[in-house]
Regions:
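N-terminal intrinsically disordered, low-complexity tails enriched in polar/charged
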Residues: 1-25
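Short coil/turn connectors between adjacent alpha-helices in alpha-solenoid helical repeat scaffolds
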Residues: 1-7, 36-54, 85-98, 128-131
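Amphipathic alpha-helical repeat scaffolds of TPR domains
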Residues: 9, 21-43, 60, 68-90, ...
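Alpha-helical repeat scaffolds
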Residues: 9-18, 49-65, 93-108, 131-140, ...
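Boundary/linker segments of alpha-helical solenoid repeat arrays
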Residues: 64, 68-73, 109-116, 143-153
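TPR/TPR-like alpha-solenoid helical repeat scaffolds
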Residues: 72-86, 147-168
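Sterile Alpha Motif
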Residues: 111-144
Length: 172
């Protein structure tokens, strides 16, 4: 087991103990993120699915459990939840996980968050919805926080990189 894995597992134990005495949306975010990290470094599909399921439960519960939660924290929880579902999609190739990602993030587009737009484009391209991919990428590229390197290197966007409109959409 690598040092990083040991550190993550140790921190999971610590945060799970904190959950018993002092739960908060921030703690749920950390607990979910730790499980997402384990899912991404695991080489076992069964382990990945287990950690993703745990992360999803923690993040979804935190989104609905608290009456008063700052919008920025709600967006972070939602983005982590969307990431978990898209990792699920990458493992299973089941389009329903991309659809769930869209359902989670669409209501948050009012915030004009680059990461929300990116994940919506990622979910759309995963479902082969090229018009919606173009729409969300257009919004993403208009935000100051867009990352061209990420867009160019992400394998999910390979099908649209060759599209006639793609180079025109990129900022000069």
């Amino acid at each position: 087991m690598s040092v990083n894995t040991t550190t993550i597992i140790s921190r999971i134990g610590e945060t799970d103990q904190l959950y018993l005495t002092n739960n908060s949306p921030e703690l749920a975010l950390e607990r979910g993120d730790l499980r997402l990290e384990l899912a991404t470094i695991s080489h076992s599909k069964q382990e990945q699915i287990h950690f993703l399921q745990e992360a999803i439960v923690l993040l979804e519960t935190a989104r609905v459990e608290y009456e008063e939660i700052p919008m920025t924290l709600y967006v972070k929880l939602s983005l982590h939840l969307a990431k978990a579902y898209m990792v699920f999609f990458e493992i299973t190739k089941e389009a329903r996980y991309a659809l769930i990602t869209q359902q989670i993030l669409r209501p948050l587009t009012i915030n004009e968050n680059a990461d929300v737009y990116f994940f919506l484009a990622y979910a759309a391209v995963s479902k082969n919805e090229l018009a919606m991919t173009r729409y969300w990428l257009g919004k993403y590229l208009k935000t100051p926080a867009h990352d061209l390197d990420l867009l160019q290197s992400h394998s999910a966007f390979r099908p649209v990189r060759d599209a006639e409109w793609f180079p025109k959409a990129l900022p000069s």
